[in-house]
Structures are given as C-alpha cells and as structure tokens.
C-alpha cells in the first residue's frame, strides 16, 4: 500500500494506492499458458502461436514446476535454427504427445490401356495433430507429382490428397512399373 500526494494551489490531497501483482502466466490468444498442459492445448489448436511461444525467452516459465528433464530436453531442442520439427520432437520427448504417423488409402494402383495422360489422387492420412514434413519422390519417368514437399499445413483435417499424373507420352509400349 502507498499514498500519492498531490499538492496544488487548491490544497493538498492524498490518494491511497493498493497494487497487487500476480503472475497469470503467459498470455496468448487462447488464454494464459502457465504450464506444459496449457502449452500442449495451445499447440493442438494453434501450432504457429505455440511455436512463437516455444521460441521466446518466456517459454522456460512454462516448464517451471515440471519434470526437471524437460528443461534439458527443451535446451537441446531449441538450438538455432529452431524449426517446427524441433518443437514436435520436444512435445513427443515429454511423453505428452503421440508422434504423427502416416497411412496411405491404398498401396497399389493398376492402369490398363491409357489413351491419354491421367491425373489421379491418392489420399494420405495422418494419425494425430502435430507437425510433419515429407518429401515425395517417384520412380518412373512417366509419373509426376504436383507437390514434392508436403507439410502438416497442407492437410485438411487429417487428410491430404496427393495428386499425381501418369504421362501417356512417356509410357512407350509394354508394362511399366512406378512408385
């Protein structure tokens, strides 16, 4: 408690002041983040904002009161340059998040007697929220993919439609196999 004294030509006035300082955690668009569980909820709903917090100097406050090994894990995973993958590995390393796994809708496709170039789509499913990045490579010069690098941001929900072309002009005659 304190008093502010105001002196003027009209007299002297005293204004009592009471200040209370509390630590409400780190404020984000989703509310206060003051522990690892709150951070994980933020990451699940807004990975980018969670990443900004993860790369800030304030992040160590989130780990106060948590397992002491988490701070060591964080320091190891936050060396520059820090990427989304580092944050993902940190979350998995705490045991509080499952790793993202991927599954194809089908593993084989057969085409017979193509008269023209064909465009098709292969659905790719991810198991849970979180960051993933993959590079797509094809075997067979008659196959082309529209996108060679796919990240978790490309998924709609848990599904990504991998579009590919089978180029008729590059098939030639006989059987052709690609991957």
Predicted regions mapped to residue ranges:
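Surface-exposed binding patches on compact interaction domains or structured appendages
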Residues: 1, 46, 57-63, 101, ...
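Generic "edge-of-domain/loop-turn" microfeature
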Residues: 11-13, 22-26, 129-131, 141-144, ...
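A short beta-strand micro-motif common to beta-rich folds, especially ectodomain repeats
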Residues: 2-10, 122, 164, 168-179
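Generic marker of "main functional regions" within proteins
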Residues: 27, 31, 134, 153-155, ...
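Long, low-complexity ectodomains and other extracytoplasmic segments of secretory-pathway proteins
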Residues: 7-130
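Solvent-exposed, conformationally flexible loop/turn segments
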Residues: 1, 111-117, 155-159, 174
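Short coil/turn segments at secondary-structure boundaries
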Residues: 2, 18-19, 150, 178
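Long amphipathic alpha-helical scaffold regions
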Residues: 21, 33-39, 157-164, 169-170
């Amino acid at each position: 408690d304190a008093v502010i004294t105001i002196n003027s030509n009209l007299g002297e006035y005293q204004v009592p002041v009471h200040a209370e300082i509390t630590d409400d955690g780190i404020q984000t668009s989703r509310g206060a983040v003051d522990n690892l569980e709150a951070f994980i909820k933020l990451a699940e709903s807004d990975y980018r904002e969670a990443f900004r917090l993860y790369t800030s100097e304030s992040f160590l406050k989130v780990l106060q009161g948590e397992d002491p090994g988490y701070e060591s894990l964080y320091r190891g995973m936050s060396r520059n340059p820090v990427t989304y993958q580092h944050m993902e590995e940190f979350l998995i390393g705490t045991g509080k998040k499952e790793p993202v796994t991927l599954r194809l809708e089908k593993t084989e496709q057969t085409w017979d007697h193509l008269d023209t170039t064909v465009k098709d789509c292969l659905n790719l499913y991810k198991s849970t929220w979180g960051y993933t990045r993959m590079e797509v490579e094809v075997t067979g010069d008659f196959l082309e993919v529209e996108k060679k690098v796919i990240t978790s941001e490309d998924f709609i929900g848990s599904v990504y439609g991998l579009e590919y072309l089978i180029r008729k002009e590059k098939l030639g005659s006989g059987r052709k196999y690609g991957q």
